[in-house]
Amino acid sequence: MNHASLRGRHAVLLAAAVLVASAASKPQTAASGKKVLFVWGGWEGHEPRKCVEVFAPLLARHGFDVEISQSLDTYLDAAKMKSLSLVVQAVTMGRITAEQEKGLRDAIRSGVGMAGWHGGIADSFRSNPEYEYMVGGSWAAHPGGIIDYEVHITDRADPITRGLSDFRLRSEQYYMLVDPNVEVLAVTTFSGQADEWIRGTVMPVVWKKLYGKGRIFNATFGHSAADFDVPQAREIVLRGMLWAARVPGAGGDPKPTNPYRFLAR
């Protein structure tokens, strides 16, 4: 059996497992009736399948109808895309056609939410600036590779981060190119040990934003599924998905941080 066949079989088995779990005991929650599409693929070093296996069952237990795909062609189905409440993408260093990208962007602009983590959303399609504009940022570097670093929550009142403490990760500390029109919920500070000239640089780690009528949630951690063994990391991403899907009680529209606004005064 070739690798493509194996990947396709894995996707089918994963989707079936989630559907069985969902059908067995689907609670009546604020998310009941909402649909989420997980799309995974790209560079396998980011463990996209394992990460999807973390979150797909969690959303099913929240009442979502869950669909899982390994094909960006799913974005071509306009009727399907508009029926969704949320797209969760885990595709690093992929290639997307103009038609696939348009299908995704049109859906988000019309009000479908989008969420993701690490390179699966912020390093997906390096040749597509409009996609990066939609997401609100893109990966630039991870100085030092896998290191220990701290994530500091900056807004403890937001429903996505409420009640959660700062936490440490052993993962890639992403250095990002970030849209100032995002609302930042958590940051990290670079020590400069790998690159001395960035010592003290404070970088967004978690943000939310709008693209048209659609809500976008991004977390820059999640290099591997092990990152989500950290309870705060897993909970932030789960809550971010609920927010992007407009689940009641998950929070309102973002208030952009815009760190440069004081320069215009």
Residue ranges of predicted features:
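Bacterial Sec-dependent signal peptides at the C-terminal "C-region" and cleavage site
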Residues: 21-31
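Extracellular ligand-binding/catalytic regions of CAZymes and related secreted enzymes
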Residues: 29-35, 57, 61-64, 79, ...
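Bacterial N-terminal signal peptides that target proteins for export
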Residues: 2-13
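Helical hinge/lid and interdomain linker segments adjacent to catalytic or ligand-binding clefts
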Residues: 29, 38-39, 43-122
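A glycine-rich, often tryptophan-bearing local segment used as a flexible ligand/cofactor-contacting loop or short
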Residues: 94-163
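Bacterial N-terminal signal peptides
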Residues: 11-21
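Catalytic beta-strand/loop cores that center a nucleophilic Ser/Cys/Thr
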Residues: 59-60, 65, 83, 137-212
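Short, solvent-exposed loop/turn segments at secondary-structure junctions
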Residues: 44, 94, 121-122, 189-192, ...
